[in-house]
């Protein structure tokens, strides 16, 4: 009998990607996050689809349509809570996935890495436009503040902002187009994920040691399918705990009030997963400078392959680089905390110090550590 799995045109692609894929035998649980992100994307698309059936993108009815979903639609509260907290899980997995890539030198697969950075930016854009849709106070003011940043672009800034708004302020036209963007972007993300996987499977996975894994590879199924299912179980458990017991813990209380253009909240802040970038933006007194720093905080990932000076790929055997990596992690946690605090001392100076340190570690200290570790590899006799 002909094995369909290996001969059927469609099954063959699936087989080469998820079943007979030769995988390094030593990859750890840090390699679980790719599949977890895929599951997060599926959850977000499915819950989002059901929410969009009941949501109306009109300034007069958007807020009440979300209330209607939670009160009157069968399990609407659950779908909404899964979608809102699913976004948080998505970003938790994303940050861990990127962190893994930095620690183990996965960025040296340049095409895969660059597509990954584009994916990160697209997911951030999707989350931003999605946050505006419930039309609560923080949704409205968050949209106003963040879109207004584009006015810092010389000459075309103001025109560009009004073009995005569809008027002279965030209003019905803005909400309608943001809903359209929020609906289409996940499908663009799905297409980018396929390209990401395509480039990854051209080279094969990296591994913790950072050395050529071709000497010892095992089939993806059953070894890593079982391993991924364990990670998936933990993530689903965490998501359900969040959605069922603490659905609003990561949200903003201001979003329980309908959007009011006449009443500004005392402290405007985005969702937790944007706070690190928001803190970098606020730490620069100049508007255009802040916008450039905000973009640089993400786009800096694109230059990482060119800043790699070490003879070793992974940080597994590089103690100085490891120390800097964990300093960078602590630094990002500090920036996230600062982004949620009001603009007053001592938060301003802490934010500025953390912002400088962020760029200093990536652009200067890590490449220097790589060179120093190379020198330490040389025999002393």
Swiss-Prot record:
<dbReference type="InterPro" id="IPR036150">
    <property type="entry name" value="Cyt_b/b6_C_sf"/>
</dbReference>
<keyword id="KW-0813">Transport</keyword>
<feature type="transmembrane region" description="Helical">
    <location>
        <begin position="320"/>
        <end position="340"/>
    </location>
</feature>
<feature type="binding site" description="axial binding residue">
    <location>
        <position position="196"/>
    </location>
    <ligand>
        <name>heme b b566</name>
    </ligand>
</feature>
<keyword id="KW-0472">Membrane</keyword>
<keyword id="KW-0408">Iron</keyword>
<feature type="binding site" description="axial binding residue">
    <location>
        <position position="182"/>
    </location>
    <ligand>
        <name>heme b b562</name>
    </ligand>
</feature>
<dbReference type="GO" id="GO:0005743">
    <property type="term" value="C:mitochondrial inner membrane"/>
</dbReference>
<dbReference type="GO" id="GO:0045275">
    <property type="term" value="C:respiratory chain complex III"/>
</dbReference>
<feature type="transmembrane region" description="Helical">
    <location>
        <begin position="288"/>
        <end position="308"/>
    </location>
</feature>
<feature type="transmembrane region" description="Helical">
    <location>
        <begin position="33"/>
        <end position="53"/>
    </location>
</feature>
<dbReference type="InterPro" id="IPR005797">
    <property type="entry name" value="Cyt_b/b6_N"/>
</dbReference>
<keyword id="KW-0496">Mitochondrion</keyword>
<feature type="transmembrane region" description="Helical">
    <location>
        <begin position="178"/>
        <end position="198"/>
    </location>
</feature>
<dbReference type="InterPro" id="IPR048260">
    <property type="entry name" value="Cytochrome_b_C_euk/bac"/>
</dbReference>
<keyword id="KW-0830">Ubiquinone</keyword>
<dbReference type="GO" id="GO:0006122">
    <property type="term" value="P:mitochondrial electron transport, ubiquinol to cytochrome c"/>
</dbReference>
<keyword id="KW-1133">Transmembrane helix</keyword>
<keyword id="KW-0812">Transmembrane</keyword>
<dbReference type="Pfam" id="PF00032">
    <property type="entry name" value="Cytochrom_B_C"/>
</dbReference>
<dbReference type="InterPro" id="IPR027387">
    <property type="entry name" value="Cytb/b6-like_sf"/>
</dbReference>
<feature type="transmembrane region" description="Helical">
    <location>
        <begin position="347"/>
        <end position="367"/>
    </location>
</feature>
<comment type="subunit">
    <text>The cytochrome bc1 complex contains 11 subunits: 3 respiratory subunits (MT-CYB, CYC1 and UQCRFS1), 2 core proteins (UQCRC1 and UQCRC2) and 6 low-molecular weight proteins (UQCRH/QCR6, UQCRB/QCR7, UQCRQ/QCR8, UQCR10/QCR9, UQCR11/QCR10 and a cleavage product of UQCRFS1). This cytochrome bc1 complex then forms a dimer.</text>
</comment>
<dbReference type="Pfam" id="PF00033">
    <property type="entry name" value="Cytochrome_B"/>
</dbReference>
<dbReference type="InterPro" id="IPR016174">
    <property type="entry name" value="Di-haem_cyt_TM"/>
</dbReference>
<dbReference type="InterPro" id="IPR005798">
    <property type="entry name" value="Cyt_b/b6_C"/>
</dbReference>
<dbReference type="GO" id="GO:0046872">
    <property type="term" value="F:metal ion binding"/>
</dbReference>
<dbReference type="InterPro" id="IPR048259">
    <property type="entry name" value="Cytochrome_b_N_euk/bac"/>
</dbReference>
<feature type="transmembrane region" description="Helical">
    <location>
        <begin position="77"/>
        <end position="98"/>
    </location>
</feature>
<protein>
    <recommendedName>
        <fullName>Cytochrome b</fullName>
    </recommendedName>
</protein>
<comment type="similarity">
    <text>Belongs to the cytochrome b family.</text>
</comment>
<dbReference type="GO" id="GO:0008121">
    <property type="term" value="F:ubiquinol-cytochrome-c reductase activity"/>
</dbReference>
<feature type="transmembrane region" description="Helical">
    <location>
        <begin position="226"/>
        <end position="246"/>
    </location>
</feature>
<keyword id="KW-0349">Heme</keyword>
<dbReference type="InterPro" id="IPR030689">
    <property type="entry name" value="Cytochrome_b"/>
</dbReference>
<feature type="binding site">
    <location>
        <position position="201"/>
    </location>
    <ligand>
        <name>a ubiquinone</name>
    </ligand>
</feature>
<keyword id="KW-0249">Electron transport</keyword>
<feature type="binding site" description="axial binding residue">
    <location>
        <position position="83"/>
    </location>
    <ligand>
        <name>heme b b562</name>
    </ligand>
</feature>
<keyword id="KW-0479">Metal-binding</keyword>
<keyword id="KW-0999">Mitochondrion inner membrane</keyword>
<keyword id="KW-0679">Respiratory chain</keyword>
<feature type="transmembrane region" description="Helical">
    <location>
        <begin position="113"/>
        <end position="133"/>
    </location>
</feature>
